[in-house]
């Protein structure tokens, strides 16, 4: 299980994980690592939260928010943001399903993808700033937001089909069992309720999961299934929705 955790951390993030820690693990086994997603999100969000706390007293809330969101993007190598941009380029092209999937595979950034990146990044910076001004404990808020975003992505894997013939997303989409889904969501909810006061954690998780479930159904109807790009989009939007629900 420890090998699987390190493999998933190396897969999702750009944190330096020695290859020997996950040596001998077959790529097809990665679907079992979905239960690690909330904890990996917790680590990435925790690092982002620490950066915010360290910079807040030195450069103020707005710049601290800017740098912690930038750090979060760098920690994942822009992996999820790239998925968000590709998804928006395809969906908002208003073409046939096959053409949408072709556009999503194009490495060039389109207008809709660029606008989506600007909107999501700017929204995160503004929401983090507002939460900090309201006295929200930012280490916990950012850590749980990332755990919620990563955990909620399982809703686009369970009982969904892969919209393409091959790709990274095929490792997870349609390969996750009901038990794994329940464990993943349960762990995300536990993290939220433990780290956030009162019923706030549970309430924000319910809002986030409901929104991502609806997103998954809309993408399924539009694309005929899910892709690795739509998983990245779900994680980014899940984080933003969770932070918005904290306001």
UniProtKB/Swiss-Prot annotation:
Q: Which reaction does it catalyse?
A: alpha-ribazole + adenosylcob(III)inamide-GDP = adenosylcob(III)alamin + GMP + H(+); alpha-ribazole 5'-phosphate + adenosylcob(III)inamide-GDP = adenosylcob(III)alamin 5'-phosphate + GMP + H(+)
Superkingdom of origin organism: Bacteria
GO BP terms in the entry: cobalamin biosynthetic process
Q: Where in the cell is it found?
A: Cell inner membrane
Q: Which UniProt keywords apply?
A: Cell inner membrane, Cell membrane, Cobalamin biosynthesis, Magnesium, Membrane, Transferase, Transmembrane, Transmembrane helix
Name the Pfam families on file: CobS
- The EC code for this enzyme is 2.7.8.26
Gene Ontology MF term list: adenosylcobinamide-GDP ribazoletransferase activity; cobalamin 5'-phosphate synthase activity
Membrane topology reported for the UniProt record:
Multi-pass membrane protein
Explain the purpose of this protein: Joins adenosylcobinamide-GDP and alpha-ribazole to generate adenosylcobalamin (Ado-cobalamin). Also synthesizes adenosylcobalamin 5'-phosphate from adenosylcobinamide-GDP and alpha-ribazole 5'-phosphate.
Concerning PANTHER family, the annotation shows: ADENOSYLCOBINAMIDE-GDP RIBAZOLETRANSFERASE (PTHR34148:SF1)
HAMAP family under this entry?
CobS
Instruction: Name the chain's protein.
Output: Adenosylcobinamide-GDP ribazoletransferase
Q: What does the record give as the organism's lineage?
A: Bacteria, Pseudomonadati, Pseudomonadota, Gammaproteobacteria, Enterobacterales
């Amino acid at each position: 299980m420890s090998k699987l955790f390190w493999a998933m951390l190396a897969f999702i993030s750009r944190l330096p994980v020695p290859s020997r820690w996950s040596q001998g693990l077959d790529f097809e086994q990665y679907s079992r690592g979905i239960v690690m997603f909330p904890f990996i999100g917790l680590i990435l969000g925790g690092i982002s939260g620490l950066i915010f706390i360290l910079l807040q007293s030195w450069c103020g809330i707005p710049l601290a928010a800017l740098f912690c969101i930038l750090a979060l993007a760098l920690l994942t190598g822009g992996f999820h943001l790239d998925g968000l941009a590709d998804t928006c380029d395809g969906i908002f092209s208003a073409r046939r399903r096959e053409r949408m999937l072709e556009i999503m595979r194009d490495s060039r950034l389109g207008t809709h993808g660029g606008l989506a990146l600007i909107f999501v990044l700017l929204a995160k910076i503004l929401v983090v700033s507002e939460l900090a001004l309201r006295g929200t404990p930012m280490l916990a808020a950012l850590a749980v937001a990332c755990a919620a975003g990563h955990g909620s992505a399982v809703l686009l894997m369970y009982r969904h089909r892969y919209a393409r013939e091959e790709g990274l997303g095929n490792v997870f989409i349609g390969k996750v069992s009901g038990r794994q889904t329940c464990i993943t969501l349960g762990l995300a909810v536990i993290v939220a309720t433990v780290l956030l006061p009162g019923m706030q954690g549970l309430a924000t998780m319910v809002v986030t999961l409901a929104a991502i479930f609806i997103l998954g159904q809309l993408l399924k109807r539009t694309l005929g299934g899910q892709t690795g790009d739509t998983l990245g989009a779900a994680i980014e939007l899940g984080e933003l929705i969770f932070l918005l629900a904290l306001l």
